[in-house]
């Protein structure tokens, strides 16, 4: 198992939505603002991935876009951790796009990052664990 390095001030953190697009909805703007403020107070630099704030319908209908965000985060050497914005029962749909993608698999193995998420993001924890990453 590969254990990612701990975070330090100035590290970039990717924000992904692997299941639901709730974080991009107007009624959650205050939660997004609070999260960004808290991460910045910790000295971290939040990076919202391209699809993370798209509406709920788009996110639900496009698991490949959600998977692309996670792949992009792992391929970016500047990003040191990935935070899932929300859990949800739709995250499992990202797994085929990732586990059949050699670039993603190589990125996880060669660019280990802290990965955190709750609820059904456990599917992604298991996926990363199978690739040798301690989450």
Summary of predicted features, one role per range:
Residues 59-67, 71-135:
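Active-site histidine-anchored catalytic micro-motif
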């Amino acid at each position: 198992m590969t254990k990612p390095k701990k975070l330090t001030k100035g590290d970039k953190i990717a924000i992904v939505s692997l299941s639901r697009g709730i974080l991009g909805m107007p009624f959650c703007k205050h939660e997004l603002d609070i999260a960004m403020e808290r991460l910045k107070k910790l000295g971290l630099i939040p990076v919202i991935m391209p699809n993370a704030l798209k509406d709920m319908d788009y996110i639900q209908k496009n698991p490949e876009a959600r998977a692309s965000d996670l792949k992009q985060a792992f391929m970016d050497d500047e990003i040191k951790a990935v935070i899932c914005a929300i859990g949800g029962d739709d995250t499992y749909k990202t797994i085929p796009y990732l586990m059949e993608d050699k670039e993603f698999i190589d990125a996880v193995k060669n660019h280990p990052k802290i990965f955190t998420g709750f609820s059904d993001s456990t599917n992604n924890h298991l996926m990363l664990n199978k690739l040798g990453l301690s989450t």
